[in-house]
């Protein structure tokens, strides 16, 4: 995947909550993973675009002792320029005894096969001891295993708060894959001016990958969980808070949703220092734009970024996936992932919104991580449709 440099004129950053000094703790370690199962759910898109792959595995230390589990949730974004390769939106998570660590990137891998090349992926968050994690994961194949080298920081000080919800509506949409892989459960909780939307994708028996967006009057928070259940009564679920918008722009941490899905406990760290403004333009991209998948409609495109609206100076490439899900409790959840590839690094933007921005309204999504000059990046990017084939992007980020 190639990209060119971002050169953007300064723009005025939107007002942000006052920043406080933060205490960071560095964590660096290596583990090994070995895939034990790999299941593909095909939806019939050209060149496998839109196909969902769930990979499960075990995590060991250098001595070979089992120390955790791995789950990767992968969607094909586009065909690679290379023969017999494809570009994949890859969400990696490992669960160790003291928490879960999430990473995400668009990776180039052999078509329909496991990864073989070295990948450097942004660490986007975590739970437990890894709450608020931001940094990088280096993943390299060694024999029948993968070396996974983590290098990240976590916030030492986080502020606690609570939210409550009066009503919760949910619905499940099923496909025909074994073990229900790819089935989707949508939920929406509402309490006064606060609400949340969750999208749970079945990753195996008793395993769900869950994306969740909390909406308040002043901003939103985007979170992710890997839920493992052995049956029985419902339990509270911990989520990694990957980023936010509005007054929560740049925030990271952890939230816990209780067993009845009506009470939420949050531990959040706000960014320190001053945010950097950023701006560019994007074309509408090309690719698959209307593929039926379980629970919704999939879009997978790749496109170009420019310094100005005249498109004379290219500043990078981007890759995007988006699923517009079925309506739940009167709203339509739209889950979007964008990887922006600049010459000096990559930036991952993701989140759940209730509009795609094609109605003329600007849409803000969290920055959840990056590589190179954007390692550990947090903040937000706002998209505004200038015309049918041009988008204006403005934002701010901390790192």
PLM regions and their residue ranges:
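Secretory targeting and sorting signals
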Residues: 1-15
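Beta-strand-enriched cores of mature, soluble protein domains
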Residues: 20-399
């Amino acid at each position: 995947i190639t990209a060119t440099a971002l050169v953007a004129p300064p723009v005025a950053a939107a007002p942000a909550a006052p920043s406080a000094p933060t205490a960071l703790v560095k964590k660096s370690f290596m583990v090994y993973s070995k895939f034990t199962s790999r299941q593909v759910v095909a939806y019939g898109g050209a060149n496998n675009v839109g196909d969902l792959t769930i990979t499960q595995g075990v995590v060991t230390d250098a001595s070979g002792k089992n120390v955790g589990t791995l789950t990767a949730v992968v969607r094909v974004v586009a065909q690679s320029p290379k023969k017999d390769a494809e570009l994949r939106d890859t969400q990696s998570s490992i669960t160790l005894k003291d928490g879960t660590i999430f990473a995400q990137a668009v990776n180039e891998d052999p078509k329909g096969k496991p990864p073989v090349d070295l990948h450097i992926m942004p660490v986007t968050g975590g739970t437990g001891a890894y709450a608020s994690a931001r940094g990088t994961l280096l993943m390299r194949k060694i024999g029948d295993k993968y070396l996974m080298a983590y290098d990240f920081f976590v916030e030492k000080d986080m502020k606690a708060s609570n939210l409550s919800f009066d009503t919760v509506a949910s619905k499940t949409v099923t496909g025909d894959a074994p073990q229900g892989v790819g089935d989707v459960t949508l939920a929406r909780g509402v309490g006064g001016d606060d609400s949340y939307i969750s999208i749970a994708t079945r990753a195996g028996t008793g395993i769900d990958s869950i994306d969740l967006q909390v909406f308040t009057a002043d901003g939103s928070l985007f979170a992710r969980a890997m839920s493992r259940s052995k049956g029985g009564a419902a339990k509270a679920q911990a989520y990694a808070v990957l980023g936010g918008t509005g007054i929560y722009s740049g925030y990271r941490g952890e939230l816990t949703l209780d067993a009845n899905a009506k009470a939420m406990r949050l531990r959040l760290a706000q960014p320190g220092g001053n945010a950097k403004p950023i701006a560019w333009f994007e074309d509408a991209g090309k690719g698959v734009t209307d593929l039926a998948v379980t629970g919704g409609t999939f879009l997978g495109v790749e496109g170009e970024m420019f310094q100005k609206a005249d498109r004379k100076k290219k500043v990078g490439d981007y890759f995007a996936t988006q699923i517009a899900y079925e309506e739940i409790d009167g709203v339509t959840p739209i889950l979007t992932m964008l990887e922006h590839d600049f010459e000096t690094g990559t930036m991952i933007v993701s989140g759940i919104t209730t509009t795609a921005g094609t109605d003329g309204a600007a849409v803000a999504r969290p920055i959840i991580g990056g590589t190179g000059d954007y390692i550990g990046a947090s903040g937000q990017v706002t998209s505004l449709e200038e015309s049918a084939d041009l988008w204006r992007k403005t934002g701010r980020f901390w790192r």
